[in-house]
Amino acid sequence: MSNYPPTVAAQPTTTANPLLQRHQSEQRRRELPKIVETESTSMDITIGQSKQPQFLKSIDELAAFSVAVETFKRQFDDLQKHIESIENAIDSKLESNGVVLAARNNNFHQPMLSPPRNNVSVETTVTVSQPSQEIVPETSNKPEGERICELMCSKGLRKYIYANISDQAKLMEEIPSALKLAKEPAKFVLDCIGKFYLQGRRAFTKESPMSSARQVSLLILESFLLMPDRGKGKVKIESWIKDEAETAAVAWRKRLMTEGGLAAAEKMDARGLLLLVACFGVPSNFRSTDLLDLIRMSGSNEIAGALKRSQFQV
C-alpha cells in the first residue's frame, strides 16, 4: 500500500470549490457595471442620432408651411382687390345712372334698422336724419375730389378715381390740388395705395382685370409729386411715414427680385415702385442699377414731369 502515491490530495477538494466560485462571482460583479455603462452610453448616442433627423424634418415642414401661408396671403389679396374693382365698377355704373345719390341718402336711415330701445330714441333718429339730408346740397357745391381729400377718405378717393379713370387728363388737373386739402397728404397717399404691391406680376399686366385698380394707385402717387406749387418748398413728411414707405419699397423690390429681377418687371409694376421712391425717398439697400432698371422699364418719359418734382434724388 505504501508503494502507491496518494491520489486524493492531487485533485481539488470540495472545500476549495466554494472559494473559486466566490472569486469568479466577485470578478463578474466588478465587470458588470462597465458593461451596463457601455450599453447606456451607446443607447444615448443612438437616441441622440435618431432625434436629429426628426428635428430637421420639423424645420422643413415649418418652412413649407410658411411658404404656403405666404402664397395664400397673395392669392387672398388678389381676390380682395378683384372684389374691390367689381365694387368700383358697380358704383361707377350706378353713378352714371343717377342711382348713387339715392343710395347715399339711404345711408342716413341706417340707424333706424337697429331695434330702438324706446320711443325717444326713434324720435331722435328721425330728427337727426332730416337735417342731414338738407346739408347735402351745401357740400355738393364743392368738387367731389376736394371733398373726399378734405375728409381723408382713402377708399372714397380710390372709388372716385376709378369711376373717372377714362378721363385721366381731368384727374391729373384735379387730384394734385385736391390733395392739398388733406390734413396729412403724405399719410393719406400711403393709405390710398395700400399694399397692392405685394400681389404677383400678373396683376400688373394690361390683360389683368386689376389693371384699372393699379392705375388708380399710380395716379395718386403721381398726383402727390405734382401737388406742391413750384418754388414753394417741400412737402413735410413725418419720419414714421417715411419708414413705412421705405418698408413698402423694400418689400416691393424683394417681390420683383423673386420674379426675375427689376429688369424683367412689367411696365406698371416698375412705374409704381419708381413713383413710390420718388415720393418718399430711396431706401439705402437700393442700388443705382435698380433705379436705372426701374427708369428703363417704367416708360419714365411719360411721367418725367412728376419725377422732376421729386424732393429726393431719383
Curated annotation (Swiss-Prot):
InterPro entries: Frigida
Compositionally biased region (Low complexity): 1-18
Alphabetic keyword roster: Coiled coil, Developmental protein, Differentiation, Flowering, Nucleus
Region Disordered, residue ranges: 1-31
Ranges in coiled-coil conformation: 67-97
GO cellular component: nucleus
Cellular location(s): Nucleus
MF annotations from Gene Ontology: protein heterodimerization activity; protein homodimerization activity
GO biological process: cell differentiation; flower development; negative regulation of flower development; regulation of timing of transition from vegetative to reproductive phase; regulation of vegetative phase change; vegetative to reproductive phase transition of meristem
Family, similarity comment: Belongs to the Frigida family.
UniProt xrefs under PANTHER family: FRIGIDA-LIKE PROTEIN 3-RELATED, INACTIVE PROTEIN FRIGIDA
Protein name according to UniProt: Inactive protein FRIGIDA
Organism of provenance: Arabidopsis thaliana (Mouse-ear cress)
Gene designation per UniProt: FRI
